[in-house]
Every structure is written in structure tokens, then in C-alpha cells.
Amino acid sequence: MQTMTETLQKLIGKPLVESTDQEIYLALLDLVRSKSAAQVRPVNGRKLYYISAEFLIGKLLSNNLINLGLYDDVRDALAAAGKSLSDIEEVEPEPSLGNGGLGRLAACFLDSLATLNLPGDGIGLRYHFGLFHQSFADGLQNELPDPWLNEHSWAEKTDITYPVTLAGKPYTARLYKLAVTGYEGRTNTLNLFDLDTIDESIVHDGIQFDKTAIAKNLTLFLYPDDSDEAGRMLRIYQQYLMVSAGAQLILAECATRGCNYHDLADYAAIQINDTHPSMVIPELIRLLGEKGIEFDEAVKIVTDTCAYTNHTILAEALETWPRSYLDKVVPQLMPVIEKLDAAAKKRTNDTGLAIIDADDRVHMAHMDIHFTHSTNGVAALHTKILKESELNGFYKLYPEKFNNKTNGITFRRWLLECDPALVKEIESLIGPGFRKDAAELEKLLPYAEDANVLQKFSQVKADNKKALADWLEHTQGVKVDPTAMFDIQSKRLHEYKRQQLNLLYLIHQYFEIRAGHTPAVPLVSIFGAKAAPAYIIAKDIIHALLTLSKVIAADPLVAPWLQVVFVENYNVTAAEKMIPACDLSEQISLASKEASGTGNMKFMLNGALTLGTMDGANVEISQQVGNENIYIFGQTSGQVIHRYAVGDYNPADWYEGDPNLRRAIDFLTGPEMLAAGKEENLARLQHELKTKDWFQTLPDFNAYVVRKGQALSDYACDPLGWRRKCLINISKAGFFSSDRTIAEYNSDIWHLGE
């Protein structure tokens, strides 16, 4: 049998020691492809098609090597030749196919499907430039294209195409296939569609382009700017390309396996991930009609085949489109949607549940709930809120459709790959079983009282912090003290996630330190977030944090105790560096607004403690670890919902009534900030906080300051107690494996392979 060194040298055509990193990377890509192809297995019974606008898959080389059982052999072979696998990984571009939690969840789910030997493929779009590449200049976010495609991409071009009609014009969707390896499991596929006519050269001045040149622009960017009509129309064009090509792929694959279309639900389960793929429902009905199936039967077939995952409590994220837009882009779907609307209106007199409302807007989530057999939330609290308030009318109409599937993460990437030193310590105590069965992490619990074990785990964290400090200096040009407490808030920039609450805390700390009240331990507060290009206030929050970072760094009294770092272009690669190094994980969304969150799970798994509200999956983390092992603060979801219902919240009352809060908000336009930042941005954010504050930052401010202070004190004054809490969090993280989530989806909704 060939050694790994011999295998790689044969692929490259020369000795490893003489090979470049690029040559080794391409050889490993070929090796992974051949090994993963051997794990493709025939489909018996029902197969899942997971349709999602985004898949934030991250770099694939190391993940695939781990899943295929090749990682150690490859690492050792390279080391023997004086090469580093981490250097080879740098050659790989990160795929620009997703942005936030929605896309990362989809990627984790694909990993778990393959690991559990379940037949399940993804369907999405092959974006050329992703959301955008973020850079900072003059304290402001700039957006640039984020290219990743090249001739050596993991996504392989096929000869398979499907015709798609957009605004009455014919287009041809090209299929690309990306292999998804499971850990000691099967290989599934992520199917990505694109147009051969896309022209990357039309992008100029950052991420500007002609939004009307559909043949050239359709898959350039994920979530193109929708601040104008052309941008909103472009999103519909994108969504229809994805679902029309995807529906044709599904029907073709099922037909090849013997499906006669009447029995489609026996061959396919389709999961609609949020509302972006909703048009797959009328498109499938339309296509089945072309196969000669009557409308009512087609509706039943599609309803039995499709299921819908709701990911939000924010009304703004429940997509609705003006009927006039759909009339223009997908006129072939409108007769179907009108019939579905009429059928829905026969089921209920509640006009709030209509698909087409009185203002001629088409509600995608309403269509999903009426014409799928399952609607699930993604955390226990989220599902409860959907049932009791946000979607209560639908719950009364279809109680049997509603269910909860608490989100999860793949431990292969978020532990095995990104924290190998921690894995080594865990295995030395409980063996390797947790790699396949995350619940086995609970075997760590007895070691929570073992000071020697706690010290070893603490040393892993210290080494990870040093590694992050080195990475920050190398990639961001920022020096940080690795012995300080690392406090991290990394997630999409949105007011409901409340980076602005963290901002106000940091300003408060600035004043406290200047007054001589130094914290229990130096604090490095690290942010990673992109703001949507048209989301002005979110970009103002970024500007305020970058400006505050300058002000603090220039103050000799404050700088030794407090540092603010904003990581540029936060992505999966950055997350893999930051998460293992985190001490305190910021999960501070306004209670009732975060559906689940999965960053909270990743930080917990890697031994960080959570500072958070009782929102999303924080509730279930608290239940798992116990209130004494998490730092909870702020209003409850019930209090928040009541405050919205009564409509009595006036931020000015809190601003006037709390001198510390007023001081922090006033500082935004104080001389120190104005000397380092831009008045327009800072004043606009200040005005927003004083007069609107839609996500109730001010009422939670004092509770946040107190609880965060307690966390800092515990970290500094009771290191043994802190370490014990960290180990308990790791041991209780098994519930949040996406393997558990996918097993629940399969047993309750999909019934794959049956």
C-alpha cells in the first residue's frame, strides 16, 4: 500500500520537498475528490433536497480531510517534508456562498446529513462575489467584490443545464456540483446553479453594477442591494432561477429512480430554508401541470413533499413582494399563486393569513405555511413565540404542522478542525467516541472538580489566545495582550443583535477607567460583523466602534485596561481563529428577536462562557448548563413583547433618567469622538438611540453593565471557578450538535430512505 507521501508525490509528479504550496493544494484537492467519489452511495427511498439562498461552507480542505480520515496522515507526510498543512490551507480561497447564521446552518446540516448516512443534497446558487469583501477606511465600511472562483474550485462544472424563463425571456441554468463529505459517512452533493453569460467585468466602484442586465449580473452577488426597485426585482430573478432549476433537477432525478410524479412525495422531501426558496411551491405545481397532473392533485403532491423552516421573528425578514414585481419577473407563476391564494381564503376568513393581501402584496411565508406539511421554528422559545403571537392565526388553523427543531452545529468543523488541542485533551479523558456521538461529551462532567484537568484546559485556552493574538497582528495589524480577557461579539451587524449595547458599555468603561475605577482584568473587546450595504444605522455602529477604538488607543490612562478590535471581513476562516480563543461570548440580542443563534453554541463548545439575554437558544443553553454557569441579564421575552404591545417605550425617558447612560450617549458626539470620527455618522446614531431605539438597548443597559462586571470579576478573582464553568459548558454542548437536529428533522418530517 502506498504511503501518503508516495500518493501525493505521484499526484504532483515530483518530491514533496520540491513542491510549492499551490501544487500540494491541487494534489490534495484531487485526492479528496477521488476518495469522496468512492463514498457516493445509491439512494433508496426518499431523498432530501435542502433549498437555501446561502451556504456558508467555509474552506473545505481540512474539513474534508478530517471527514475522510486523511487529516493526520496528510499532516504528518507534509511535516516530514518540511511543509505545513496550515500553510497549504492558506492557498485555498474561502467560498463566497453565504453570509450569516442562515448559510452556516445550511452548511452544518449538509455535513450532518452525510455523516448520518442520510441521502440529502443542497440546492443553491453559485455566487461569484458573495455578499462583499469588507474593508475599513477612515473608520467606515467599504464594500468590494469577494472573488473566489477559479479553474480549481471545489464546485465542478457539469454538462447538465435547465431552461428557465425570466420576464418572458429564455435563460439556461448551468449545474455545478460540490461534493459534501460526511465524517465516516457518505458523500452527498451541493448543487449550485449559474448562468454561463455572467460578466464579472460589469462590476465597478466597489460593488456597483447594472442591476437590469440580468444575463450578466444574476449570480454576481448574494443579496444584492435592495434599496431600489431594480435591486428588489433582481432578488426575485435570483430566487426564481434557483427554484426553477432546482425543481427541474428534483423531478429529473426522481424520474430516473422510477417516480411517476404522482408519487413524488415518496421519492423527495424538500426543505424550504427561510422564505427565499418559497417559489419552489408554485413552480413545482406548474411543472407537474405540464406533466399532465391536475391542479388539486399537484397541490396535494407538493404539500406532502415540501416543509418550511421559519428563521425569524422580525417582520421585515418575512418576505413579501408587490404583485406587480412577480407579474413582470415570473408571469408564468402568477396564475398558480392566485389559485393558491383562493384556496387558502376558502380555508379561513382571517384576511391576515392571505397569500395575496389587500395591498396586492404576495406573502411568501404565508404560502409556505398553507402549502407545506410542516412549519418549524429553530429554538424552543422561537417556536413558542411563533405559535403564541407572530404566527398565532396559522397555528390555530394548522396546529399539527407546527414543531420545533432547535438548531445545531457540526462538531467536525467547530471542534475537531478549529480546536485540535482541546480535542486532544478531551480524548485523553473520555476517548474518541464524542467525534461521532456528541452526547459523550457529558462524560467530562466528573472532571469539573479536578484542578489538574482544569489547568490543562485553561492552558489550551491560553495557547489559543496567543494564536489569535498572532493572527490579529498578522492579518489586522493590531497587537493585543493575550493575558487579557477576550470578549467577543461576532455576528451579522443588526440593531436587534445589539452591538450598540456593547458600544455603550465600552464607553461607560472608558469613563470608569478615567475616573480611577479600573476593571478586575484588562479587557480586549473583539467584534466581527458585516453591515448590509444599504443599512445606514448598522454602518454607523461600525463607525462608532472603530472611532472609539482610536480614542481608547490614544488614551494612556485607558489603553492598558481596555482595547476595541474590529476584525475586517469576518468570515468562517476568522471565526475558526476567534472562537477557540474566546473567554466571554456576547449573545445579547433583544429577548424575543433572535430565532436561535448558533454562534452561542460554537463558543460554548470551545469553552467560552455566555453573556446573554434569555433569547433564542440561549434559553436552552441555560437549561443545559444551569444558571450558575451562564451570565444572563435583561428583560424577558414576555416583558419585551408586552412593551411592544402597549407601545409605552420612550427612550428619552431612560436617557434623561440615567446619568451613566446619558453620559455614554452624549459621548458619541463629544470632542474626543468628533476629533477621530465623522459627525454625520455619530450624530445619526446618537439621535437613533435617543429617539427610537427600536430594539430597547437603553432598558437593558444597567443590567448588562452589572452582569458583565460580574463576569470580569469572576474571571479575575476566581480562576478555578471560571475554569469549572468552562468545562461544564463543554460537557453540556452535545445537545447542540447538528447531528441531533438532523436526526429530529428526519424522524419527524423527512423520513429519508423510507
Feature names for model-found ranges:
Residues 1-754:
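A conserved ligand/cofactor-binding region detector
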